[in-house]
Amino acid sequence: MVTLPEITEVLSAHPGVRRAETAIVRHNGRDVAIAAAELSEYVSGPILRNHVRQELGEDSGLAGVLIVEHMPMADGAVDVEYLASAVTEGRCTLFEDPRDDVERQVAAIWSAHLDVRSVGVNDDFLELGGDSLSALGIIAAIEAEFDRPLDVYEFMSAASVRRLAEILR
């Protein structure tokens, strides 16, 4: 089992991270590990989460990374209530595995074209490092896999695996 200090250490070693802290927060009736990261250069939360999963394994336990300007602290430790509110308010996207074959196929295509090991169904295409070139490659792969046309506007407005899978169903 990976510990919170191990997650913090891996995040802190990332070249784009100035400081990182981790905590367990309660969300939808379960405990989830969330990290807060102050950045020295721009990198998205999903990319940092993927970095941790690459270093510590898929079962690292890290559900999400909140990008902060200044580390939220309370009584000398990371402010767990602040992190929990960020998750509740949707400012921190939590990793969620694909739930059916369509989502799994779309996530696998994104993973291959974006060179991201784990793509969650709520991850944003642009936050994963997507650009116009990768969009065209993904669109071509999806058209081939699902045997249906998909235009750029349709793809970009979907923005996540889950929403794109809904369009493809």
PLM region spans:
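A generic structural signal for alpha-helix starts
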Residues: 1-2, 43, 101, 133, ...
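Phosphopantetheine carrier-protein modules
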Residues: 16-24, 28-30, 107-128, 134-135, ...
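AMP-binding/adenylate-forming catalytic domain of the ANL superfamily
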Residues: 18-19, 28-32, 56-78, 134, ...
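AMP-binding/adenylate-forming catalytic core of the ANL superfamily
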Residues: 1-58, 109, 140
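Adenylate-forming
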Residues: 1-10, 57-64, 92-96, 124-127, ...
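Acidic/polar alpha-helix N-cap and adjacent early helical turns
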Residues: 1-2, 69-123
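Short, compositionally simple motifs enriched in small residues
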Residues: 129-130, 142, 164
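Actinobacteria-biased recognition of intrinsically disordered, low-complexity terminal regions
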Residues: 1-2, 166-169
